Amino acid sequence: MAEKRNIFLVGPMGAGKSTIGRHLAQQLHMEFLDSDTVIEERTGADIAWVFDVEGEEGFRKREEGVINDLTQEQGIVLATGGGSVISKESRNRLSARGVVVYLETTIEKQLARTQRDKKRPLLQTDEPREVLEALAKERNALYEEVSDYVVRTDDQSAKVVANQIIQMLEER
């Protein structure tokens, strides 16, 4: 793992990127960063506000800049936003600057994990399942393209998934 010290987590909303990322960082004594949190810190507003005011395109532009900045750090675990892989530049930076782990999960698990979360602007709809299915259709191939590893998170605790990732990296 020496040549690629950073660990970047990609996957859909509700896959567990932030929770698993915190466990990974703690166990590996690395810094944990969340691109959505950094966007909120830099704008002084939450993601939903950025979406409302700047639209998805404005948000994606901000996200691309944050991904560029954060992937230049050393020794980090980065939880990316679910749509970060839409940008080819972001995919290239993630691939070049760290080990990319795709956290895969089912639509059912995504719904269960996100149903009470009001901070997900794309899910503020009467048909969240349809939105998640459309996003999966658009993004799953991009997650696979950019990833070095794929890990299912459906019925496992964040700690178990973090341990699986550590084991994969050690076997590398």
Swiss-Prot record:
UniProt pathway: Metabolic intermediate biosynthesis; chorismate biosynthesis; chorismate from D-erythrose 4-phosphate and phosphoenolpyruvate: step 5/7
Binding sites annotated in the UniProt record for ATP: 14-19, 120, 156
Compartments in which it is found: Cytoplasm
Cofactor(s) needed by this chain: Mg(2+)
GO biological process: amino acid biosynthetic process; aromatic amino acid family biosynthetic process; chorismate biosynthetic process
Catalytic activity: shikimate + ATP = 3-phosphoshikimate + ADP + H(+)
Cross-referenced Pfam families: SKI
Positions annotated to bind Mg(2+): 18
Enzyme Commission number: 2.7.1.71
Annotated disulfide bonds: none
NCBIfam families tied to this protein: PRK05057.1
Family from the record: Belongs to the shikimate kinase family.
Protein name, entry field: Shikimate kinase
